[in-house]
């Protein structure tokens, strides 16, 4: 075979092998790319599963420890309801009720000394509001019974959340996730990193083979063009000739890589189908755990409703305590003012007596002065009456009536 025909044979052989290799590499590269995307997507899926399970776990702990034990148990039941309402407020109402009862008794023991009817100061006040706290105190045992009933429900709910949900369902969920994706041969991170590394290596192998075949094709094209000097042309011919003999081996390696890629894709597909079943089981378990968590959270509305009722009862009790305190203060002022009134009555009586004494003394002086005046008028008439005409001072010359007219009344106090 002539050198020219050999060059053409090298060229067409290189072109055919390169075209075949490009097609195989493209298909294999697509397979590797899809595997890579699938593994990365699964990595995100596993991370999302882990995050969601972690959220369910944290939410369960938050429900049990913060909401139920701390807020409902300690703050509401033990502090707000039992200590502040049933102990402290009840004690305050009892003290206020005893205080107002004592005030009423003091008024009942104090007789009204001003009208002589035998009435007491208690007869002058309304008894309408003195039993306000007594009625509320009767309601306290009912509230206490409700609180004890709610406490039993609370303890049952805490037990269910801690034992059934937190220690059972959620822990099993965490264990199932760890068994499916984080332990031993099922460690998905190790699995995905291992296969991603293989994918990168196979991509490199494909690229190397394709580069080698492309370089050979470029050399064949340059040799076929015949533009090189004779010595370089001869040297290139030998290189191309030797490379041409390696093409079958290179294509064999490529086909092995292609088979490895197909086998790898099959293994990944089988493994991910298994993981898909694990994922679905976990999602079902997560859904049940989340539904159970929501169910227990809905029970919190019971505590909220009871808390609203107790707060209203407490506000009503405090309002009545305030009214009773105002009444106690009013009764104190009433009793004190009555004592002051008695002193005021005595003062007025003394003033009336002083006025009576003054008027009696004045009356005596007026009578003495009037008697003296009468004698002097009589003497005047005896000496001068016969000489004065009546009409010079009509009705007065011979008038012997007193010059004063004194009438008075001292008000009886």
Curated annotation (Swiss-Prot):
A Pfam family in this protein? ATG17_like
Primary site of residence = cytoplasm
Record's keyword terms, sorted: Autophagy, Coiled coil, Cytoplasm, Membrane
Report the InterPro entries cross-referenced here: Atg17 (IPR007240), ATG17-like_dom (IPR045326)
BP term (GO), one: autophagosome assembly
Its subcellular locations are: Cytoplasm; Preautophagosomal structure membrane
Record's GO cellular component terms? Atg1/ULK1 kinase complex; phagophore assembly site; phagophore assembly site membrane; vacuole-isolation membrane contact site
- In what way does this protein cross or attach to the membrane? Peripheral membrane protein
Coiled-coil regions, chain positions: 262-300
* Gene Ontology MF annotations: molecular adaptor activity; protein kinase activator activity; SNARE binding
Which superkingdom, per the lineage? Eukaryota
Say which family it is in.
Belongs to the ATG17 family.
Name the job this protein performs.
Answer: Autophagy-specific protein that functions in response to autophagy-inducing signals as a scaffold to recruit other ATG proteins to organize pre-autophagosomal structure (PAS) formation. Modulates the timing and magnitude of the autophagy response, such as the size of the sequestering vesicles. Plays particularly a role in pexophagy and nucleophagy.
PANTHER family in the record? AUTOPHAGY-RELATED PROTEIN 17
Protein name in the entry? Autophagy-related protein 17
Gene assigned in the entry: ATG17
């Amino acid at each position: 075979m002539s050198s020219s025909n050999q060059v053409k044979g090298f060229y067409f052989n290189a072109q055919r092998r390169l075209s075949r290799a490009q097609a195989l590499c493209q298909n294999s590269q697509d397979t590797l790319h899809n595997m890579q995307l699938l593994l990365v997507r699964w990595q995100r899926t596993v991370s999302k599963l882990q995050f969601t399970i972690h959220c369910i776990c944290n939410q369960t702990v938050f429900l049990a420890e913060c909401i139920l034990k701390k807020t409902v148990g300690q703050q509401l039941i033990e502090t707000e309801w039992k200590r502040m309402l049933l102990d402290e407020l009840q004690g305050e109402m009892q003290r206020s009720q005893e205080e107002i009862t004592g005030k009423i008794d003091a008024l009942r023991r104090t007789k009204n000394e001003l009208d002589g009817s035998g009435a007491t100061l208690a007869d002058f006040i309304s008894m309408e509001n003195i039993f306000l706290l007594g009625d509320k105190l009767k309601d306290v045992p009912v509230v206490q019974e409700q609180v004890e009933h709610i406490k039993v429900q609370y303890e049952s709910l805490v037990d269910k959340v801690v034992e059934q949900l937190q220690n059972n369902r959620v822990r099993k969920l965490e264990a199932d996730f760890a068994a499916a994706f984080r332990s031993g041969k099922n460690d998905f991170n190790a699995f995905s990193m291992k296969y991603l590394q293989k994918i990168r290596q196979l991509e490199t192998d494909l690229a190397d083979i394709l580069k080698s075949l492309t370089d050979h094709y470029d050399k064949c094209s340059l040799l076929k063009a015949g533009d090189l000097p004779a010595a370089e042309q001869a040297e290139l011919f030998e290189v191309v000739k030797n490379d041409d003999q390696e093409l079958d081996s290179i294509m064999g390696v490529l086909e092995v890589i292609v088979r490895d890629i197909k086998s790898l894709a099959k293994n990944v597909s089988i493994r991910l189908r298994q993981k898909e079943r694990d994922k679905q089981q976990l999602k079902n378990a997560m859904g049940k755990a989340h539904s159970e968590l929501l169910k227990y959270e809905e029970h919190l509305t019971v505590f909220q409703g009871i808390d609203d009722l107790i707060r209203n009862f407490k506000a009503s009790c405090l309002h009545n305590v305030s009214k009773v305190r105002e009444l106690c203060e009013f009764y104190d002022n009433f009793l004190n003012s009555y004592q002051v009134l008695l002193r005021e009555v005595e003062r007025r009586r003394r003033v009336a007596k002083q006025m009576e004494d003054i008027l009696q003394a004045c009356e005596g002086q007026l009578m003495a002065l009037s008697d003296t005046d009468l004698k002097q008028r009589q003497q005047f008439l005896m000496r001068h009456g016969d000489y004065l005409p009546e009409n010079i001072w009509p009705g007065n010359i011979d008038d012997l009536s007193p010059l004063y007219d004194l009438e008075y009344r001292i008000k009886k106090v």
